[in-house]
C-alpha cells in the first residue's frame, strides 16, 4: 500500500465536493493506494505543462483527480494536487496555477 498525501489546496477541493462525488473520490483513492499507475499520464494539456502528473476519472468522468508520484523510482507517496471538474479545463488550470505557486520553475517530474 502506498501513502496518499493531499496538498492543502486539494484538501479544500475535496471538502467542497458534494456527498456522492466524495464517495466516488474515496473509492478511487482506495484503488490508487494499491496501484499508483491507475491514472493516465498527463503531458501538455491546454498549454499547461502537466508532465509528471496523472489523472484519474471520477464520478462518470465528470471529475478528475490529478496527482503525481513523489520519487517515481522508489514510490512511497502519491501526492494529490487537485480534485475537480474537467469542464472548461477547470481542474487543469487550477493545477497549472498551483504548480507555478508551489514549484515555480523547479518542477520535479
Language-model-detected regions and their locations in the chain:
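A general secondary-structure junction signal
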Residues: 8, 44-46, 60, 84
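Secondary-structure boundary motif
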Residues: 16-19, 34, 72
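Enriched for short, Lys/Arg-rich terminal
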Residues: 58-64, 68-109
Amino acid at each position: 500500500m502506498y501513502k496518499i498525501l493531499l496538498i492543502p489546496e486539494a484538501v479544500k477541493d475535496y471538502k467542497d465536493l458534494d456527498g456522492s462525488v466524495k464517495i466516488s473520490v474515496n473509492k478511487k483513492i482506495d484503488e490508487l493506494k494499491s496501484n499508483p499507475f491507475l491514472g493516465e499520464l498527463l503531458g501538455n494539456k491546454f498549454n499547461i505543462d502537466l508532465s509528471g502528473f496523472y489523472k484519474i476519472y471520477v464520478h462518470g468522468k465528470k471529475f478528475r483527480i490529478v496527482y503525481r508520484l513523489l520519487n517515481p523510482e522508489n514510490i512511497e507517496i502519491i501526492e494529490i494536487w487537485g480534485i475537480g471538474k474537467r469542464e472548461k479545463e477547470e481542474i487543469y488550470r487550477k493545477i497549472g496555477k498551483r504548480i507555478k505557486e508551489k514549484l515555480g520553475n523547479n518542477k520535479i517530474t
